[in-house]
């Protein structure tokens, strides 16, 4: 089972709102997921990002791969650096 951390689109037409979810890569984008670990609202100025850091780190340590967009959100939040430091024992 290839697990991905990706965005699930919510909201209405022309007003997107996303949930950051952990899902099997074979499931549809807005379909079934394993766990919700955050939200992303690109419409708000500045964009609102809420991520459960402990859950995100836990899933990435288990091998879940973030999508490109989620990876960028995690980098801006400092999560990728935390993961790198934990893996290298700093």
Swiss-Prot record:
Ribonucleoprotein found in the keyword field: yes
Disulphide bond pairs: none
Molecular function terms from GO: structural constituent of ribosome
Keywords attached to this entry: Ribonucleoprotein, Ribosomal protein
One GO cellular component, as annotated: small ribosomal subunit
GO BP: translation
Short name of one Pfam family: Ribosomal_S16
Gene3D superfamilies attached to this UniProt entry: 3.30.1320.10
Matching PANTHER family: 30S RIBOSOMAL PROTEIN S16 (PTHR12919), SMALL RIBOSOMAL SUBUNIT PROTEIN BS16M (PTHR12919:SF20)
The protein's name: Small ribosomal subunit protein bS16
Gene: rpsP
């Amino acid at each position: 089972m290839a697990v991905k951390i990706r965005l699930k689109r919510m909201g209405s037409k022309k007003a997107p709102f996303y949930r950051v979810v952990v899902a099997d890569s074979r499931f549809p984008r807005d379909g079934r997921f394993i766990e919700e670990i955050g939200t992303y609202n690109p419409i708000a100025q500045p964009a609102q990002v809420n991520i459960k850091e402990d859950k995100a780190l836990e899933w990435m340590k288990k091998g879940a791969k973030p999508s490109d967009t989620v990876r960028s959100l995690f980098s801006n939040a400092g999560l990728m650096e935390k993961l790198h430091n934990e893996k290298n024992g700093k």
